[in-house]
């Protein structure tokens, strides 16, 4: 029996690559939208590559033809190239939803962010939640997947640990269970055949910020030195950024510094361990020539 055709938007991104590989390994006919086909690093008999840009609706005509499910990881961390969060996280995904409806797509799966409903006052979450509202009112069957954060989002802990000391706001007791992209991809693909409308998901182990700082220092074989900064410093930095910089600059920092002052803990899932990820990152960095290592850490 031939499997359903799935469309992946955002397939060249970190999570999108894992989702595409997972779909292909499960035998799904997989169509991916890319701006530059040359960026695709893998091939498969079931892989269909379509050149299009989700921010330009005229390039999406019939992109969803014969597709049963659309999976979108489209979104930006930093606003660049003249594009805002509203342009990409909301409008580009809304373009896809409109095209999906025209072509009779049955289900739309969107990867958002944990606690986005509580963080609508942040620019990035405002756009993601507006898209979530649009999807819910679209008439399509849908699932909104809300990950707690990726292992790769913990990179700042490693950067500080390399210098021998990790700085945290507050007492470091807020909880988070970040997830590896491969584990999240499996969970996303599983939603194709279940009827859950929203899923909060994180990695297999819950950590405090102190725990993560200790793991990062251990990865560098450094003594555990954690400095706890008073939370008013975090609040002042947020105020300063909003007052004296534009949203293009402060958007990603605004989200990061707000999320660091709340629990970002979700249903545990997966098998990858953060400590293994940290050790691999450190080992890989040590294998690089000095100039390449400096570039990687920027």
Predicted regions and their residues:
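Glycine/proline-rich active-site loop of Rossmann-fold NAD(P)-dependent oxidoreductases
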Residues: 152-159, 190-199, 222-224
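Substrate-positioning beta->alpha
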Residues: 170-192, 197
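Non-catalytic, hydrophobic alpha-helical segments
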Residues: 15, 70, 184, 188, ...
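Substrate-binding strand-loop-helix patch
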Residues: 175-182, 201-219, 232-239, 272
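NAD(P)H-binding glycine-rich loop region in Rossmannoid oxidoreductase-like domains
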Residues: 7, 38-95, 99-102, 115-117
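N-terminal Rossmann NAD(P)H-binding glycine-rich loop of SDR-like oxidoreductase domains
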Residues: 4-26
